[in-house]
Regions:
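Beta-rich interaction/scaffold domains
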Residues: 1-80, 88-89, 95-99
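Concave beta-strand-loop units of leucine-rich repeat
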Residues: 74-84, 97-114, 118, 124-244, ...
Length: 303
């Protein structure tokens, strides 16, 4: 690795996986100058330090040495169909996928993938994270360090996901999505996105086993927010009783909550504007729809 010198700063850029401790360093300077500390005595090259260079005539100048740890990027889509492929990709310590990340396969005889925890190095996926039918994990552990993504897709409106063991949808570090979340799976029970504040696209869930749906800091959904609990018989299901998205202020499209059989209350305490409201198929036992701050509905209200 070669360092760059700009003004009085010496900067070396290395992949975040590389340690420079005890590195062999080659440096050149005029033999009449002195450097304090002597670089030959330094072993900890991973940390910032200052070197004082004194020329033969007594002029002194200080240089700050800095290390920049760069991300490891993968260009294009990454498709992981087997446990071996997951392990091989994880070994690269990639932090950024510049494309879609596709986990599993929809093929009938595809190998089951039960563990993606080795993908913990990932911090960003610019495209969609797609979970296919052969993923057999109970949650998305391994994607917990992803801060931003283009979208998250589990199944679709045409074909529901058959990931039979997937009970929890959660990504602990996720803060922003530039696209959609779409989850169509009968086994998903718990949904939790602790840090997700902005979704530029839509939120689409159809989960007939739903018990909990938590977005504690979500403020903005750019398009529709649609939550459903239809089961395979096309009837209302789910055991969630109370729905609250406490910080939500804006939904660009329609806010729709329907076909949740046990729902008794829903609260959107800070919602000010939405493109529409659709609560046309709610259970008889629903007691409360709380929208105390609503000011603007740009479309229809259906109840």
């Amino acid at each position: 690795y070669t360092a760059d010198i700009t003004d009085n700063t010496v900067t070396i850029t290395v992949p975040y996986t590389v340690s420079l401790n005890n590195a062999e360093v080659e440096f050149k300077y005029t033999t009449s100058a002195t450097i304090i500390p002597d670089p030959e005595t330094v072993t900890d090259w991973d940390n910032e330090r200052t070197f004082r260079v004194t020329s033969y005539n007594g002029d002194a100048r200080e240089y700050t040495y800095k290390v920049v740890k760069s991300e490891i990027e993968s260009d294009g889509d990454v498709e992981l169909k087997t446990t071996e492929e997951v392990a091989s990709f994880a070994a690269t310590k990639t932090t950024v996928v510049k494309g879609n990340l596709i986990i599993g396969s929809d093929a009938e005889e595809a190998e089951k993938i039960t563990d993606i925890s080795a993908l913990a190095s990932l911090k960003e996926v610019t495209g969609n994270i797609v979970i296919r039918n052969s993923y057999n994990g109970a949650d998305l552990t391994g994607l917990d360090n992803i801060v931003s993504a283009g979208g998250l897709q589990v199944g679709s409106t045409d074909v529901a996901s058959k990931a039979t063991e997937l009970h929890m949808i959660s990504m602990k570090a996720l803060e922003t999505l530039s696209g959609d979340i779409s989850v169509y799976n009968d086994q998903v029970t718990y949904v939790l996105f602790e840090k997700l504040a902005t979704i530029e696209g839509s939120v689409m869930f159809n989960a007939s086993s739903l018990q909990s749906f938590e977005f504690p800091v979500l403020t903005t959904v750019g398009q529709d927010l649609n939550l459903q609990g239809l089961n395979e018989e096309n009837t209302a299901a789910g055991s969630i009783a109370s729905l609250e998205i406490p910080e939500l202020t804006s939904v660009g499209g329609v806010l729709s909550v329907n076909n949740l059989a046990k729902l008794t209350s829903m609260s959107f305490l800070k919602l000010k504007e939405t493109g529409g409201l659709d609560f046309h198929t709610v259970p008889v036992m629903l007691e409360t729809i709380n929208l105390p701050e609503i000011e603007t509905v740009n479309g229809s209200i259906i109840m």
